[in-house]
Amino acid sequence: MKKPKTLAYHALKSIAQLEQVSDFHCVEGWSVADIKWEGFRFSEIVRLVKPEAQAAHVVFHSFGKTGSAPGGQDHYVESLPLSELLDPKREIMLVLNMNNNPLPEDHGAPLRLISPYDLGYKSIKYITRIEFAKEARPGWWTLANPIYPAVARVPKDRLRKR
């Protein structure tokens, strides 16, 4: 993106919202079924900001400082390939509402990513900045806990058939 763009909360709310019901799967082995999310696909951000052609990955930055700074990261960061964010089969959304209510603070308000086929730490909460990048960047969880891989698919035996 040649020129950074700031999108206020009301601008995000003005994007055509869609609803999606999906499950959330934590890396610790627990899941929550049938969460109703309301938000928009990442393609809406791409449409608004028109990233540079060489952007292959997206880095999400989270609000607040962490107690440690692995790899020099003092706040939560997560990275996903742009191609996955744009793939409708992955059902990835930026969400503002959860179960018919504004997204609660403990679930990532004002804005969080939902990536239902990835483990929960890829669904970064408290998003304050979105950066388009040429290369992937390791997330905070992967740097702090090398047992957490950068690619974190939910094991097939934990996915329900719909």
Question: Which functions belong to the PLM regions below?
Answer:
Residues M1, H10-A11, S22, R41, ...:
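A compositional/structural signature for long, glycine/proline-rich flexible linkers
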Residues M1-W37:
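A glycine-rich, hydrophobic loop/mini-helix early in the fold
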Residues T6-A8, R41, P81:
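Short, solvent-exposed coil/turn linker segments
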Residues A11, E28, G39, S62-G64, ...:
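A mature extracytoplasmic/lumenal domain signature
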Residues L48-R162:
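Extended, aromatic/histidine-rich regions of cofactor-dependent oxidoreductases associated
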Residues E38-R41, I45:
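Stable alpha-helical elements in mature extracytoplasmic
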